[in-house]
Amino acid sequence: LAGCEYTTVYKGKEEQLPYGYEEKIKEDDTYAMYRSGSSLPFSYVYDSYMDKEDYDKLSVTEKQQAALQVCVVDKDEELTGLNEASESVKYTDQEIPYEVESSKDVKVLEDGFKVSRNGGSITLKFDGLDESETYLIVEDMDYQSEKQELEEAAAVNLNIEYENNKKTIHYMTDKNNFYCGVKDFLVNMGYHRGGGKEMTISFQKAGTYTFSDFRIVCQPVKDFSEMTAACKQNGLSDVTFEGNSMTGMITNEESQMLCITIPYCEGWTAYVDGEETNL
């Protein structure tokens, strides 16, 4: 959605590449750069929309799918000629059931895990989907240290390993000087042609870890190319930048919404054929 055509990874860590980044462009002793043939361009269009109130009710994985199919707008926007498509958005993500295999250092609780030793771990056993990205999603995370010292309770890591891909959740408690209230995490463990069978999670520090939700979700990618192709059907041409403005040309036979991948901030004004329009 942000129009990122290129990405880099450490050499030898290609399993961390997001789906679609397959063409190696260049490399040095440390990094390799890859290009995606499915990335969206600098600008693209939508011909349907979803009300933001409906969008906010979706799960995190549903939101990323919706954003590829419809434009999200506030309810009070006047959108003549566009389709309201909240009911027709296609969702293919699947929550995957799992069994917990814990070590002697981890006790499974109803809402989390009690870890008695630094580095204690659990293994989640499940049947992952083929041709999918696999996510670990945790919500409303909380950590209570076994010790009372401030430094022991300020931050903690969860180290996750799945199919040779390693990721880390760095969680800061409200005792951390850099605490910012983040308690929900989605960890993308990568795209795999064949579904994996287990995910190992190790807890850096002893203590009690609780969550309101702790789940595995697989996101099939078979419809991804079709969705991006629909967005690419139209967009700006002859784009020029000058000072704090940009211009471009677009021709469309029916009403569409144009998305330009410039991060939004207050102060922008848009004109279509010389007439000011809504942003």
Tell where the protein language model's regions lie, with residue ranges:
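Active-site-proximal, structured, solvent-exposed surfaces of multi-pass membrane proteins
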Residues: 96-279
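A cross-kingdom signal targeting lumenal/periplasmic-facing segments of multi-pass membrane
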Residues: 1-104, 112, 116, 123-127, ...
